[in-house]
Every structure is written in structure tokens, then in C-alpha cells.
Swiss-Prot record:
Protein name, per record: Large-conductance mechanosensitive channel
Membrane topology category: Multi-pass membrane protein
NCBIfam families named among the record's database cross-references: mscL, PRK00567.1-4, PRK13955.1
Predominant location category: membrane
UniProt key word Transmembrane: yes
Role description: Channel that opens in response to stretch forces in the membrane lipid bilayer. May participate in the regulation of osmotic pressure changes within the cell.
Lineage: Bacteria, Bacillati, Bacillota, Bacilli, Bacillales
One CC-aspect GO term: plasma membrane
């Protein structure tokens, strides 16, 4: 049982997932700070100094805190956009690296083709002399 657990726990995918969760948490903290400390105050200035988190409607004794919802929605949009940009950058970087590898393989094949062509021509010359 211990052996099976060890094999499961130390597979590459599990470790990659653990690293992704830790990095994602750190990234989330950065984005949250960015939203709370930069975006929210700027939006407050744009809409006339309003702090979204304090916006509410009182109905009887109940308070509907729609400002918190607006803030959560803004946080979500910014986090989603940040993740989109990060993934887009990583995909572009990966694609560029793959293209470079393909170009290297094509270049290598071209050299091989050139050598094979030279060998073929030399063999033709030798067979024509005989």
C-alpha cells in the first residue's frame, strides 16, 4: 500500500499540479493586491470617489451589499484577464520554441539531402566512367 501511494504521490503530474497550485496562490495574491490597491481606487475616482464595497441598499432591516458583488465581479474580470494574458504568453513562447526546433530539424535534413545528392552525383560519375 505504501509503495502504491509513493508511486502515486511522486508522479510527475502530481508534482506539477502541486507546483501550479502554489504558484497560482501566489499569483492570486498579487492580482488581488493589484485589484484592491490600484484598480479599485482608480475606479472610485472615475465614478466620483465611490468605494464599491460600501454600496448597499437597505430594505427593511436587510442590507443588500451589491457593492461587494460589483467588487467581486471586477476582481474576477481582472484575474481572468491576467490569467488569459499569462497563458497566451506561455503558449506563444512554447509555439516559438517548437518552431525553432522544427527549423533546426529541417536545416539538418537539408544538409543530409545535400550530402546525399553529392554522393548520388559522384556515384553517377563513377558509373559513367566505367
Amino acid at each position: 500500500m505504501w509503495k502504491e501511494f509513493k508511486e502515486f504521490a511522486f508522479k510527475g503530474n502530481i508534482i506539477d499540479l502541486a507546483v501550479a497550485v502554489v504558484i497560482g496562490g501566489a499569483f492570486g495574491a498579487i492580482v488581488t493586491s493589484f485589484v484592491e490597491n490600484i484598480i479599485t481606487p482608480l475606479m472610485g475616482v472615475i465614478v466620483g470617489g465611490v468605494d464599491f464595497t460600501t454600496l448597499k441598499v437597505t430594505v427593511g432591516e436587510a442590507e443588500i451589499l451589491y457593492g461587494n458583488f460589483i467588487q467581486s465581479f471586477v476582481d474576477f474580470i481582472i484575474i481572468a484577464f491576467s490569467i488569459f494574458l499569462a497563458i497566451k504568453f506561455l503558449v506563444k513562447f512554447k509555439r516559438q520554441k517548437e518552431e525553432e526546433e522544427v527549423e533546426a530539424v529541417v536545416e539538418e535534413l537539408s544538409k543530409q539531402e545535400e550530402l546525399l545528392t553529392e554522393i548520388r552525383d559522384l556515384l553517377k560519375e563513377q558509373s559513367n566512367k566505367n
